[in-house]
Amino acid sequence: MSTKRRYEMKILGIVAGRHGGNSEILVKEALVAAAAKGVECKMINLFDYHIEHCTGCESCTMQMGEVAMDPTKKYKGCILKDKDDMDKIVNEMQTCNGVIVGVPTYDLTPSSLYLKFAQRFLAYELSFRMEIGDVTEDPHTVAGLIAVGGSCHDWQTLTLEGMGATMFTQSITVVDQMMATRNGRPGNVLLRPEQLERAHKMGENVVEAVNTPVEERHWMGDPDQGLCPNCHSGLIFRGEPHWDGLQYPFECAVCGAGGDLVKGEDGQVKFILAPNGLARDRNINESRALHLKEIVSTRIDFMKRQGEIQDLKKHYKEITFPAI
């Protein structure tokens, strides 16, 4: 089904926390700021929708690979789309110019409700849907991300990064993000006016980004946030060879930027991008297309060699243990 943008500017708030909770309050404050600038705003709380877990069936990636090799074939989308609300939500989201997402932190990471939602995004990969005509107009969506937790950054180390990692399959550019700390009870954030002000500013930043020509858009959050100069993630890991041999000394775990860690004269460690450091930037559609080639290549190799493992597959299938 084709989707078309119907409004001059539209921002969708997405909440993965309880009704009346801190995540919802902060998203509402950001939307208030956007609405004050004449933007149409909508908000959903994921607790109000039925969302099935991704089953790992690979139907979407199998279809994508087949369509990539034979454009005459039709992409039917996620096999769960008639069983829950995911199709409705994503089709609406892919008409929005901006999204503001509020998620509580559980065990250092985004809540399972948000991840259940976001890990269904692959079947709706925006650049692929545009290529085959399912989506007729690129909304060039920008995002503001809000992580909320009862403690400081040391107990929310993976939340913003985990949220950021879910944006690229929708070709969404994150222009701002904030971490709301020490909010242990519903409504706690109302005692922290500086966090409400920051959420308000995020709403204004998202509107400003939407009004900025796509090629001129830039990071509008804290310039010193994170180590990665590309996506402002704080997660940098020692690089290892990619499937095609590319390797960097260090990489950003979120966007895939490559470079090296360098200590400056001020004693501060910085992540300096390599000359080709954005060659695998996951925010770039062409870079993700390379990943699709990797998936297709891996699948072709498996299909050629699957006869070698039939006895082993049977062996492991026949092994059983008592369940609980």
For the regions a language model picked out, list residue spans one by one.
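Short boundary motifs at domain starts and secondary-structure transition points
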Residues: 1-5, 134-137
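N-terminal beta1-alpha1-beta2 submodule of the flavodoxin-like/Rossmannoid cofactor-binding fold
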Residues: 2-102, 108-123, 197, 202, ...
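A generic secondary-structure micro-motif detector
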Residues: 20, 79, 153, 178-180
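Short beta-strand elements in bilobed, periplasmic/extracellular small-molecule ligand-binding domains
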Residues: 40-43, 172-180
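Flexible, glycine/proline-enriched loop segments at strand-loop-helix junctions
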Residues: 104-107, 148-154, 189-191
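Short, glycine-/small-residue-rich phosphate/pyrophosphate-handling segment
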Residues: 111-113, 128-177
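Short, well-ordered alpha-helical segments in soluble proteins
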Residues: 118-121, 125-129, 147-150, 167-174, ...
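A short acidic, helix-capping loop that chelates divalent metal ions and anchors anionic groups
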Residues: 183-187
